[in-house]
Each structure stands twice: as C-alpha cells, then as structure tokens.
Amino acid sequence: MNSKQRQVRRLTRRNALKILGSAIGLPVSILGVRNFASSPMLVQWHGEALGAEASLSLWHPNPRVARQAVIMIGSELRRLESIFSLYQTDSEILRLNKEGKLSLPSREFVEVLDVSTKIYNVSDRAFDPTIQPLWDLYSKHFSAERSNNATLETERIVAACKLVSFAEVEVGSQAINFSRKGMALSLNGIAQGYITDYITDLLRNEGFDNAMVEMGETRALGAAPDGQPFIVNLMNPIQPSLIDRSVSLTNEALSVSGGYGMLFSERGAHHIFDPLTGNSANRLLDVSVIAPSAVIADGLSTAIYVAGEQAAKNIIGSYPSARATLTRVDGSTIQL
C-alpha cells in the first residue's frame, strides 16, 4: 500500500472558545429568552466529552422536552465514550491499541476512520490519527520529575515516529487491524467533532430548531432564537487572556487548533504533533475552520495547523464549503 495514500476498504484548545448567545453579545447563560416572539425557554447542560469541557444550550417552548433531551443525550455520550475514549479501559479504541486489532467495530468507529482517511490523503499525511505513540512519549517524558525543560532525545522521537503511519491501518466493517506492533490511535483530533455532529443531528431529529452544541467542538443548530447568528469569541493565540476575535455561526460548525491548548514544557512542546518529524507543529499559531459539519472542521483545523500555510490552500480546497483563518507566527492572519 502506498505510504502516502490509504484506500477506504486538551487543558484543551477548546478553552479558546467562548460561546455567546446572539449578535448582541449576551452570554448564553443570561439570554433573555422571553423577549423572543415564540417565547422559547433555555435549558443548559455542562459536563465533559472525551476529556474536554462540554455544554448544551437548548431552546424549546416546553422546558420539560429540553430536559428530557438532555437525559437522552447523556446516555448517548456515555455510549460514544465507550467507543472513542482513551480513558475508559474497555473502550473500543483502547482495545484496538492494546491488541492491535478489533473485531466487529462499531459503525461510528468506522465512520470516523473513513473521514480520517480522506483528510489524511488530502493533507499529505499532516493529519494522522496514529500519533498516539508520540503523545505517550511526550506525556511520560515531560510528566517525569524535573523534566519540564529537559530535551527529549531525537532517537526516542525517531523510534516513536516509526509507529506513526495511518496508511498501515486496515479499516473494514468486520475488523480494524494495525500492520505493526506498537501502533496506536488517538482520535482526539476528530472524534470530538463527530460527537458534536451526532448530538446536533439527534437534537434536530427531536424537533429542536435552535441549539448550541459544544462537545469539544462547536456547532450551531439553526440561529439564536431572535433570528441572529450565534457569536463565538476566540482568544488571542499570543495573549490567551485576551478575547479579540469573533465568528458568526448559523447551521455551521467551528473548530480551532493551536499548540497553546496544552503545553508540555515552557520551551513550547505541545500536543499537536507533526507526524513526519515527531516534533510539535510550529508553522502557525492557530487555525480556525468553519464548515457545515464539526467532524470536517475538526479534522481540517488539525491538518492545516500541522501542514502550514503553503499546504493549506490545497487542503481547504478539497472541501469547498469550508473556510479557514490562519494565524501566522508573527501574529498576522490570512483567510482561505
């Protein structure tokens, strides 16, 4: 199989987002929902999904219906975490990582890997879900006592990189297999987007017209109840304490990728790796992508952040409905 093509057959960066209720800039938590003509009521939920902060803001004339939806969503989140979580010892992904194979994978697992395959290919391997060996290496090294600024030996990075190759993952409806012992998946760069879409679609099927879904990625169902877009404010990647950018969302999703989301060391080692070098990606400060679905926005923001500006146009061009904003290392921005 060609090493560059596969055939189908976070502390996290999410803290960079602050969801606001409508174009007037009122936080969701204090929206005056009774001011809207249809008098929808706001019901909110806050929790976690795959280790990231998660929240729902639902508007419905009958708050009991919204609360029942939240209960249903909680059950679905637990089921999805049993597939994708790296923290549940019996999850599908951990069983695959431990054994190198997984029989009868869930439909959701296969769907995420199929989306990953396309982004892996169009990004020329910049997006590679098999980077878990690098995560394990960095995490163990920098969590050791007095190693915050200790240099990670090149030989260890090179050894871990030899286990990174999504082209060597065989994906099928009956089984998923690694071709090499020691390989491991991390779907944190795309599964949260998939879950965000899943919950959004569930709400739409339950009759909701207005919702903001944050399951590690952000997706707007419809607009705010007053008909205005939802506004999402983003932090400044150079000074994370500042919020100086905003985007409007109506029936769209947003993902932001940046190394500031989780730093391993004061020297800049972080959680988004270049699978070709094994080092933390450093071509850009951050990337925000808006797309019709959160799973695409999630994968593309990671891919472009790793690949850099020169490759970004080709990557985003493969998804005509998506658009991206790149923040260069000098702080300037470019929109694609």
Cite the ranges covered by each PLM segment.
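Mature catalytic core of soluble alpha/beta enzymes
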Residues: 1-336
